[in-house]
Amino acid sequence: MYALAFDLKIEILKKEYGEPYNKAYDDLRQELELLGFEWTQGSVYVNYSKENTLAQVYKAINKLSQIEWFKKSVRDIRAFKVEDFSDFTEIVKS
């Protein structure tokens, strides 16, 4: 299982995407969901697939690199392998 995490420069995003700039995050979410990624939090997306996982990361990076406003506003983008993904939300909330 692999994940993608990215950070965008908001001032550049506002200029390149326009207002409301936060809709850009919805657009990215839709694109990544089409490639099998699920939004977890912030700008972190996980692909839970057991097959061709690195290929899915490549497809996602390739797709994102074709979005002009994303290319101009991305500050950092990382892909990483997830060995264990534990949800501690209930422990914290109870």
From Swiss-Prot:
<dbReference type="InterPro" id="IPR019199">
    <property type="entry name" value="Virulence_VapD/CRISPR_Cas2"/>
</dbReference>
<dbReference type="InterPro" id="IPR016368">
    <property type="entry name" value="VapD"/>
</dbReference>
<dbReference type="GO" id="GO:0004518">
    <property type="term" value="F:nuclease activity"/>
</dbReference>
<comment type="function">
    <text>Cleaves ssRNA, mostly between U:A; cleavage is not dependent on mono- or divalent cations. Can cleave RNAs as short as 6 nucleotides.</text>
</comment>
<protein>
    <recommendedName>
        <fullName>Endoribonuclease VapD</fullName>
        <ecNumber>3.1.-.-</ecNumber>
    </recommendedName>
</protein>
<comment type="similarity">
    <text>Belongs to the VapD ribonuclease family.</text>
</comment>
<comment type="subunit">
    <text>Homodimer.</text>
</comment>
<keyword id="KW-0694">RNA-binding</keyword>
<dbReference type="GO" id="GO:0003723">
    <property type="term" value="F:RNA binding"/>
</dbReference>
<keyword id="KW-0540">Nuclease</keyword>
<dbReference type="Pfam" id="PF09827">
    <property type="entry name" value="CRISPR_Cas2"/>
</dbReference>
<keyword id="KW-0378">Hydrolase</keyword>
<keyword id="KW-0843">Virulence</keyword>
